[in-house]
């Protein structure tokens, strides 16, 4: 099982940060690996919401379907892949702090095949990339660009 954590503090209210992160269609605006992202189920975002994400990982284009498995507004957002190269779970927690929001992201996966062989490299590269993307989100949100 591959697992890593990244975090940042964003100088915006927790409601704003949660709204941006929980809407998968915002991912390509701040994540360098997300090429496309769209909600595939109707209605507001909540438990059971589905989405399709096209990403580029280690130079490979990958398409995955995700489902929201936990949804606590302004507190926690969990999604799990339902298709794609390997099972993946993304847990994001939100903590209101003075002057902003603390965002913690945990990514867990069970790589198989090529990805299993490259697991140490994938974890290292993915952690660095995820932290960079979270820092980009911070910059965009603090500049009111998102």
Language-model segments: which ranges?
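Short beta-strand segments that buttress and anchor functional surface loops
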Residues: 50-56, 77-83
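Residue-level preference for beta-strand/loop junctions
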Residues: 2, 45-49, 60, 86, ...
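A short, structured loop/turn motif at beta-sheet edges
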Residues: 14-15, 45, 69-74, 93-102
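Beta-strand elements of well-folded, non-transmembrane domains
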Residues: 12, 57-59, 109-113
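Beta-strand/loop substructures that line and gate deep hydrophobic ligand-binding cavities in soluble
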Residues: 78-132, 139
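Short, charged/polar surface micro-motifs in flexible loops or helix N-caps
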Residues: 58-61, 70-76
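Hydrophobic ligand-binding cavity/cleft-lining segments
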Residues: 1-41, 142-145
């Amino acid at each position: 099982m591959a697992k890593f954590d990244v975090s940042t503090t964003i100088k915006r209210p927790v409601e704003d940060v949660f709204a941006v992160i929980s809407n998968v269609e915002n991912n390509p605006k701040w994540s360098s690996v997300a090429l496309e992202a769209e909600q595939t189920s109707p209605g507001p975002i909540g438990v059971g919401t589905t989405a399709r994400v096209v990403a580029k990982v280690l130079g490979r284009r990958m398409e995955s379907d995700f489902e929201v498995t936990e949804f606590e507004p302004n507190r926690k957002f969990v999604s799990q892949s339902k298709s794609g190269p390997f099972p993946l779970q993304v847990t994001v927690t939100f903590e209101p702090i003075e002057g902003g929001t603390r965002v913690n992201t945990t990514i867990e996966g069970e790589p198989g095949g090529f990805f299993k062989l490259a697991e140490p490299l994938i974890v290292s590269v993915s952690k660095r990339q995820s932290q960079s993307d979270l820092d980009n989100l911070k910059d965009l949100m603090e500049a009111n660009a998102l």
